[in-house]
Amino acid sequence: MTKFPRWLAMLVGLLFPLSALTQQQGLTIDIVGGNTAATPIAVLPMPYHDSVGAPATDVSSVVAADLNRSGQFRTLPLGQIIERPTHGSEIRFPTWQALKQDYIVVGRVLDARQGTYRVEYELFDVRNGKRMLGLAMTARASAMRDVAHQMADAIYEKITGLRGAFFTRIAYVTASGSHGAMRYALMVADSDGYNPQTIVRSAEPLLSPDWSPDGKKLAYVSFEKGGSSIYIQDIATGSRELVSSFRGINAAPSFAPDGHRIALSLSRSGNPEIYVMDLVSKQLIQLTNSFGIDTEPAWSSDGKFIYFTSDRGGRPQIYKVASVGGTATRVTFQGNYNATTSVSYDDKKIVVAQGSGNVYRIAMMDQSSGSTVWNTLSTGSLDESPSFAPNASMVLYAAREGGRGVLYAVSADARVRQRLVSVDSDVREPAWGPYRSVH
């Protein structure tokens, strides 16, 4: 069966058939595959140094899980950790050299009083014994997972030179119930699926969530009024604004890097075209005017260009146009179907849903070398909606397995893949959020 294109399904409000499911909970995660060439690192247990009131979060296990799923690191299994130093002065480096570890992380958790904890940790290069990092963080028990993600970010950046993206959030849509009584929810969770938060619930489809650059708001499409409308909602307060409810199609909102504009697809003048809306004045600028369907805009990091999906040439392909208007140019030429693009932070790469026959997979186009190089990242047959992590080290996407929707996060080299599943609902429409502020 030929897949009903996502970009057209979005415009008319159709979704894949769903099995009977109940209310949604958080996402569970499991690692699929591994990278044997990844950098070996030992993240040692970090014991709590007090008699009562240990935090529920095992900080070291969260750090290890983050590094593992990045695809860049391979942590030493707990059963192979034969010594457990908690300070750098206690490390016997020949032990870890014999275990073929390149790096080691040690630390401890202390009671900082008044309901807070202090985590102290150190990163060492096993080969020369040099301390690369020595930091401490204090937080309440409820924020210990945030602390662990920030630790993983610091370790990742110190070794790779690239900012980590573990202390980030993802947005996604869940769908549950039967055909006669479907329920949808727009959710936000940590990058590893923990700490889910419901942003909005609806009896009608919710589509195309997109993060504001500061991570405080989400734009999305709702069908609660019968037709499609675009809302922007504050994550912390829940307040929301209806920004587009024109006659016809209102679809695919995408925040500009400045946060003051969105690109969107509207059919107010006939065919769906790409527009830019000023969020203060609500003034519209029409960027495209073709006989085909133009939708799914995505901004370049500098805000000068907008990539979008169009079937103006007969089949869906990716094009780009200046954000102030002008002639659109075609970007993708490989294959008969390229849609739903996400652009990396440095504009050197894009990811798309790429179709061949009845198989749709996530593919990345790398232009950093001056020539176009494609790499297939996913392995399913109905994969869609790719979204880059803010450092472009991983890609989040939606897939169909056994008749239901799941999410995957895959490393940019395609060697490590993690599955994020809800036990009681379909999951789809993922969007990886921006970097979060560290307070």
UniProtKB/Swiss-Prot annotation:
Swiss-Prot/TrEMBL GO biological process terms: cell division; protein import
UniProt keyword Oxidoreductase present: no
Alphabetical UniProt keywords: Cell cycle, Cell division, Periplasm, Signal
First and last residue of the signal peptide: 1-22
Major location (coarse): periplasm
GO cellular component terms listed in the entry, alphabetical order: periplasmic space
Subcellular location: Periplasm
Function per UniProt: Part of the Tol-Pal system, which plays a role in outer membrane invagination during cell division and is important for maintaining outer membrane integrity.
UniProt subunit comment: The Tol-Pal system is composed of five core proteins: the inner membrane proteins TolA, TolQ and TolR, the periplasmic protein TolB and the outer membrane protein Pal. They form a network linking the inner and outer membranes and the peptidoglycan layer.
Family, similarity comment: Belongs to the TolB family.
Protein name in the entry: Tol-Pal system protein TolB
Protein source organism: Xylella fastidiosa (strain 9a5c)
Upper classification of the organism: Bacteria, Pseudomonadati, Pseudomonadota, Gammaproteobacteria, Lysobacterales
